[in-house]
Amino acid sequence: MTNWQQQLPLTDTQKNELDKSVLRYLNWNYKQTVRHEHAQDYESVRHAIVTLSGFLLQESVDRQEFISNNDTSNESMVDIDELLLPKKWNSIVRLQKKIIELEQNTETLVSQIKDLNTQVSELAQFKPTTSNGTSAHNVLKWIPRNLPSCLINVESSVTSVKLHPNLPIVFVATDHGKLYAFDLFNYTIPLASLQSHTKAITSMDVLFTNFTNSSKKNYLVVVTASKDLQIHVFKWVSEECKFQQIRSLLGHEHIVSAVKIWQKNNDVHIASCSRDQTVKIWDFHNGWSLKTFQPHSQWVRSIDVLGDYIISGSHDTTLRLTHWPSGNGLSVGTGHEFPIEKVKFIHFIEDSPEIRFRTPSTDRYKNWGMQYCVSASRDRTIKIWEIPLPTLMAHRAPIPNPTDSNFRCVLTFKGHLSWVRDISIRGQYLFSCADDKSVRCWDLNTGQCLHVWEKLHTGFVNCLDLDVDFDSNVTPRQMMVTGGLDCKSNVFMR
């Protein structure tokens, strides 16, 4: 046996069948391209193929069969195996593609099984301390699995998503100005839908009121901001599953970029920011504008509120802290290279000294109620800042600290490949989404990226939401929802 026969991974029978298939394909190919236009050339080619068959086909019966099947005098004879080789080739390509898909699906399923096994192990170690029988500490350690539990489709790109604080309902706002409510256990048809604005909704926030006055009934409030320069306030009527508009807030002179609603005692306020460079504070009960101030020289893109303080991020690449009742600007953060898309306070949580940034470092910060904030930017980074303490005086509004009025960047997260659109903090994890079509989970303690979801959306990921971990009125659940330019919203549940 020669060396080439030893290297060929075929038996003699398989080699013979392959040779016949090659010869038949060559014969068919030249019949199509040469025979009718250049008969003389075809005869010479056919003669060469017949000669080649003498070398390749070992059995005389096979050679005679090949020659007779390619006899030009018999026009009616058709060799059904002439295209056997290209058919097999095409089948192999399809099979290889199918194998790759099956391997990917298998890998995903194996990952899900590992996640479920981990969850079972964690559940076996849980010490129930909450009303739903789940350890609050372990709830905050939850990282969503690779694939969503359900997928919600709407008519246009999703611009904002919010989870109901207590019920399995997600609110979805779109670029066409529509507002939806979906039941997470039956999401094929929305519970309610409303054309709330004439242009795109840019931001949405929700609050379940907690009035101590028995004469006021508690309910969920949904607030939306839009490119139509308006802010709309809705009451979610759970019994009828519908949005009931309470009022509209008018006053901004350009696109309203973001909106926040919060409650302090029995007072409910709404904050909004706009491309008109202003931030406004509204009274929820009567719709009056209580305060207007201009913290930035360009478009104010994002705000967050904690008590009497507002943090704002702007197109001018800075973020600023303002005491909203007085309008006093207290401190500024510089370090981003491009506009800031999102800002948030990092709230303190009790009994978690092991989590970085969630516990005050000094008693002064503890008494003040805040110390850190986070910002996401178009420069593809996320930064955590330490906020300098202002000068606090009894019975007076705080003023800037004359010796320290600049934020200090203490940690930078790098990994996204495009604009970072939204962020959310839960326990020791920071979740972010970006225009690179990915969602990432970061560890606050180490700054490392722990997990990446790369194929949730086919376009930009515009927004995400998780249950907050600092509000006792919010049921501690393990849920995350994302919204994207592809008109889809992914929901993760444990």
Curated annotation (Swiss-Prot):
Molecular-function GO terms, alphabetical: dynein complex binding
Boundaries of every LisH domain copy: 14-46
PROSITE patterns per UniProt: WD_REPEATS_1 (PS00678), WD_REPEATS_2 (PS50082), WD_REPEATS_REGION (PS50294)
Keyword Cell cycle on entry: yes
Key word DNA-binding present: no
UniProt-annotated location(s): Cytoplasm, Cytoskeleton; Cytoplasm, Cytoskeleton, Spindle pole
Keywords: Cell cycle, Cell division, Coiled coil, Cytoplasm, Cytoskeleton, Microtubule, Mitosis, Repeat, Transport, WD repeat
Recorded coiled-coil stretches: 90-123
Segments annotated as WD repeats: 153-192, 196-244, 251-292, 295-334, 347-395, 415-454, 457-492
GO BP field: cell division; establishment of mitotic spindle orientation; microtubule sliding
GO cellular component, one term: microtubule
Domain of life: Eukaryota
CDD domains documented for this protein: WD40
Entry's family note: Belongs to the WD repeat LIS1/nudF family.
Cited function: Positively regulates the activity of the minus-end directed microtubule motor protein dynein. Plays a central role in positioning the mitotic spindle at the bud neck during cell division. Targets cytoplasmic dynein to microtubule plus ends, thereby promoting dynein-mediated microtubule sliding along the bud cortex and consequently the movement of the mitotic spindle to the bud neck.
Comment on protein domains: Dimerization mediated by the LisH domain may be required to activate dynein.
Subunit structure: Self-associates. Interacts with NDL1 and dynein.
UniProt protein name: Nuclear distribution protein PAC1
